[in-house]
Amino acid sequence: MTNIRKSHPLIKIINQSFIDLPAPSNISSWWNFGSLLGICLALQIVTGLFLAMHYTSDTDTAFNSVSHMCRDVNYGWVLRYLHANGASMFFICLYLHVGRGIYYGSYMFKETWNMGVILLFAVMATAFLGYVLPWGQMSFWGATVITNLLSAIPYVGTDLVTWIWGGFAVDKATLTRFFAFHFLFPFIIAALVMVHLLFLHETGSNNPTGIPSNMDMIPFHPYYTIKDILGLFMMILVLLCLVMFSPDLLGDPDNYTPANPLSTPPHIKPEWYFLFAYAILRSIPNKLGGVLALVFSILILFIFPLLHTSKQRSMTFRPFSQCLFWLLVADLLTLTWIGGQPVEQPYIIIGQLASILYFLIIIVMMPLTSLMENHLMKW
């Protein structure tokens, strides 16, 4: 009799994806973040569902409904802070996952990579919508400033902003539709994740050497299930430390003040995970130029396969490319710091230099360095 795991039409799909899946024997802990992202998504959907049961998407009651959750609902504060800090963990895992892909040349799986970049855009959009919902000062002004960027689009910009707002300012209609879309998007993301995995399982995983590993595969279960569970425990430990000891560490104190259209906060800034893009936006004095730089700072990920000039796939054996990669990481950390600072010198010039360096490293320096390494290897 055939094992039901291998014969049942539905269980067979799960078996081929998570149990009997052939995986390279040498993939490191950097390959753990895919499973952690799946768990983050599940956590966000579950906590978000319970939060939605108590939330009201009306400008008069939204702030108070969030306050009521934290004060009067059994363990409501745990749900709220798991959801807020879960988003931070989501982005930490996302950025590490993308960084791993760049370092080890995983972007050469073009379909998987492109799907991943689309997923990154979807998660960023969802996080932005979610940040508006508590209807604090930073929620309101963040929504106003970021949606207003669309007015930089020629001809249709102003009409587009009015259409998104549902009026002539961020108000009840805006909050209601943002809540509707924030609820809907995670399920779309879950569907996109399925497509991402479908493309990945067509080619199999990459590995740290960048060399095809078809000759040396091991089953995903139990080897990598155990490894993923270890990563899961470590992530949960960090998340619970955040939630239990300093739940507001990554948030903004201004969001504990109810939204007031008549009073602008001294420094409008998004959540920490958008600060690098916000710094690039602010570093260009022209509005349309800033918006284009903001969009291209993420869109640039799509052209990584086109910019790959090395004869080797991975950076494991390419020390010069490694130096550039870590320079890029340092540059992104600098941009994140600048995004949280006021618009004054010396922060303005540092932000402008870091923004130029970001695009320069990716578009010019990395491809040229790869060509130089090819020459040094006499390839």
Curated annotation (Swiss-Prot):
Entry binding sites for heme b b566: H97, H196
Record text on cofactor binding: Binds 2 heme b groups non-covalently.
Principal location class: mitochondrion
Single GO MF annotation: metal ion binding
Positions of transmembrane segments: 33-53, 77-98, 113-133, 178-198, 226-246, 288-308, 320-340, 347-367
Sequence positions that bind a ubiquinone: H201
GO biological process terms on file: mitochondrial electron transport, ubiquinol to cytochrome c
CDD domains named among the record's database cross-references: cytochrome_b_C (cd00290), Cytochrome_b_N (cd00284)
GO cellular component: mitochondrial inner membrane; respiratory chain complex III
UniProt keyword list: Electron transport, Heme, Iron, Membrane, Metal-binding, Mitochondrion, Mitochondrion inner membrane, Respiratory chain, Transmembrane, Transmembrane helix, Transport, Ubiquinone
Subcellular location: Mitochondrion inner membrane
Bilayer topology annotation: Multi-pass membrane protein
Cofactor: heme b
Record: residues binding heme b b562: H83, H182
Record-linked InterPro entries: Cyt_b/b6_C, Cyt_b/b6_C_sf, Cyt_b/b6_N, Cytb/b6-like_sf, Cytochrome_b, Cytochrome_b_C_euk/bac, Cytochrome_b_N_euk/bac, Di-haem_cyt_TM
Subunit-structure text: The cytochrome bc1 complex contains 11 subunits: 3 respiratory subunits (MT-CYB, CYC1 and UQCRFS1), 2 core proteins (UQCRC1 and UQCRC2) and 6 low-molecular weight proteins (UQCRH/QCR6, UQCRB/QCR7, UQCRQ/QCR8, UQCR10/QCR9, UQCR11/QCR10 and a cleavage product of UQCRFS1). This cytochrome bc1 complex then forms a dimer.
Function: Component of the ubiquinol-cytochrome c reductase complex (complex III or cytochrome b-c1 complex) that is part of the mitochondrial respiratory chain. The b-c1 complex mediates electron transfer from ubiquinol to cytochrome c. Contributes to the generation of a proton gradient across the mitochondrial membrane that is then used for ATP synthesis.
Stated family: Belongs to the cytochrome b family.
Extra remark beyond the main annotation: Heme 1 (or BL or b562) is low-potential and absorbs at about 562 nm, and heme 2 (or BH or b566) is high-potential and absorbs at about 566 nm.
Family matches, as PANTHER family: CYTOCHROME B (PTHR19271:SF16)
Protein name: Cytochrome b
Native organism: Vespertilio murinus (Particoloured bat)
Gene responsible for this protein: MT-CYB
